[in-house]
Amino acid sequence: MVRRLIIGISGASGFQYGVKALELLRAQDVETHLVVSKGAEMARASETAYARDEVYALADFVHPIGNIGACIASGTFKTDGMLVAPCSMRTLASVAHGFGDNLLTRAADVVLKERRRLVLMVRETPLNLAHLDNMKRVTEMGGVVFPPVPAMYRKPQTADDIVAHSVAHALSLFGIDTPDSAEWQGMAD
């Protein structure tokens, strides 16, 4: 089977995480299926210099958020799972409560019901009790809550270094290794 991953980009700050995932996966020859929420489109326009077509060109397939009939909305369409990068608290809540009211949340629901890997790069701070409860629910359902916390031990020089390391670590949870996912070798004596 071809390696195939769904990339969801939802409306939290950090659109760059989704773009970096697409860039790293293209270099790994992984077939990507992209779905972008309306909130994510707003974040792209306000936080980045990326043009929509430039981002969409990084994916093998782009699915409109309203297309509930897309291939990724069915469990018979085999994937390695789904990465939502970034994941808004609205998307987290929808996934935690089984609301598949758009293609992004429907695809996440399908990934969970098929017992495939779902990784949510949640972007919010501070957290309230509803956020924590939703994270707990998703974890109990088999999903992975993965806040993109900077790894300062890597001595990042740029924001892109921080983004690349977080995304590479998230992709390693799917068994996808990238140059940015080097293993920690311990501290020098």
Curated annotation (Swiss-Prot):
Q: What is its EC number?
A: 2.5.1.129
Alphabetized, the UniProt keywords read: Flavoprotein, FMN, Prenyltransferase, Transferase
- Pfam families on file: Flavoprotein
Q: Where does FMN bind?
A: 11-13, 37, 88-91, 123
Catalytic activity of the protein: dimethylallyl phosphate + FMNH2 = prenylated FMNH2 + phosphate
User: Which GO molecular-function terms appear in the entry?
Assistant: carboxy-lyase activity; flavin prenyltransferase activity
Similarity-based family: Belongs to the UbiX/PAD1 family.
What is the protein name stated in its UniProt record? Answer: Flavin prenyltransferase UbiX
Q: Which organism is it from?
A: Neisseria meningitidis serogroup B (strain ATCC BAA-335 / MC58)
Classification from the root reads: Bacteria, Pseudomonadati, Pseudomonadota, Betaproteobacteria, Neisseriales
